[in-house]
């Protein structure tokens, strides 16, 4: 991975005897070497792979934004920037029930010609190691894959377009922890691009496009398969869905209108690009549902062929079961 590291520093969040959250500040930034580059590269990879990220932008009175601008102009050095932010983060984090201990990371770096600022809390975990004398001892390690309190600012987009609603991204975290609320409060930011909503609108626009074109079932399935393959390819490549590019992959309607023209004429309000939602994209070629101890998933092509649904009785009929399922059912009659 091509990554150029500019600055990185660690501070530690811990609780004192009164269970109050404290910050143990490192005295200076870390040296830029292979270890720190590998750390930031792993942070970038894990953050990028996290599903369901939120996007936003700074509020007009954001202190974090003021400090960031001062950092960008060279009026504030990286160490002082990290200290100011650490104080504010500690004050905000103390308001929430998940005020975890951990390692606070600030990193400024470039990857694939894009500049980023990363802020995150890395959980510390314990494991065992074997010493040179072949004894067993405990050791702490950074559990980066379990990171769920982190945000990243695309500095390249931020510098080019401060009116953008998506230069800031953050991990939404586990349900019930309100991690997203915390990070928005800390950064004094507001929700911007809703990528899941954009994906839902895309799916609706595709359904409407097929209906408007009066396509046969087989043609509809082929359209959805093409959209799935494009979106899935973008997910694997770490790229976003580009509506113009997607439209170029699809054949026009019988009237000659492209998918892009259709979405623009009908006013769907789709952004030019946005991250694909893996769960929603999957439903283009599959019917998926779970609940009440039942988990059902099958290719959409099978509906009406081997699988039939009766909405009046809410009954799903399957003709021809998979061999391994049939074997289990036969043995346990």
UniProtKB/Swiss-Prot annotation:
InterPro entries: Nucleoid_associated_NdpA. Pfam families: NA37 (PF04245). Keywords: Cytoplasm. It is found in: Cytoplasm, Nucleoid. It comes from the Bacteria. Belongs to the YejK family. This is Nucleoid-associated protein VV1167. It comes from Vibrio vulnificus (strain YJ016).
């Amino acid at each position: 991975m091509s990554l150029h590291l500019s600055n990185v520093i660690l501070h530690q969040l811990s609780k004192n005897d009164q269970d109050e959250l404290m910050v143990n500040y490192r005295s200076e930034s870390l040296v830029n070497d292979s270890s720190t580059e590998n750390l930031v590269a792993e942070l970038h990879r894990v953050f990028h792979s996290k599903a369901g990220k939120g996007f936003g932008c700074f509020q007009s009175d954001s202190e974090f934004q003021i400090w960031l601008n001062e950092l960008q102009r060279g009026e504030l050095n990286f160490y002082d920037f990290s200290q100011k932010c650490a104080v504010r983060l500690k004050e905000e984090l103390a308001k929430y029930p998940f005020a975890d201990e951990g390692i606070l990371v600030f990193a400024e770096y470039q990857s694939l010609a894009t500049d980023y600022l990363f802020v995150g809390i890395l959980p510390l975990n314990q494991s065992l190691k074997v010493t040179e004398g072949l004894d067993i001892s405990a050791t702490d390690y950074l559990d980066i894959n379990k990171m769920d309190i982190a945000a990243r600012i695309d500095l390249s987009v931020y510098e080019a377009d401060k009116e953008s609603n998506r230069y800031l991204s953050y991990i939404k975290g586990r349900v019930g922890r309100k991690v997203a609320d915390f990070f928005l409060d800390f950064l004094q930011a507001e929700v911007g691009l809703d990528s899941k909503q954009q994906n839902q609108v895309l799916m609706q626009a595709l359904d409407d496009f097929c209906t408007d074109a009066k396509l046969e079932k087989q043609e509809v399935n082929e359209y959805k398969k093409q959209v799935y393959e494009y979106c899935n390819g973008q997910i694997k490549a770490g790229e976003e869905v580009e509506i113009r590019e997607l439209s170029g992959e699809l054949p026009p309607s019988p009237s000659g209108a492209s998918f892009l023209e259709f979405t623009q004429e009908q006013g769907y309000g789709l952004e030019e690009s946005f991250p694909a939602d893996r769960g929603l994209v999957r439903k283009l070629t599959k019917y998926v549902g779970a609940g009440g101890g039942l988990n059902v998933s099958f290719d959409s092509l099978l509906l009406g062929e081997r699988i039939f649904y009766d909405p009046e009785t809410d009954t799903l009929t399957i003709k021809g079961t998979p061999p391994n399922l049939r074997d289990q059912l036969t043995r346990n009659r």
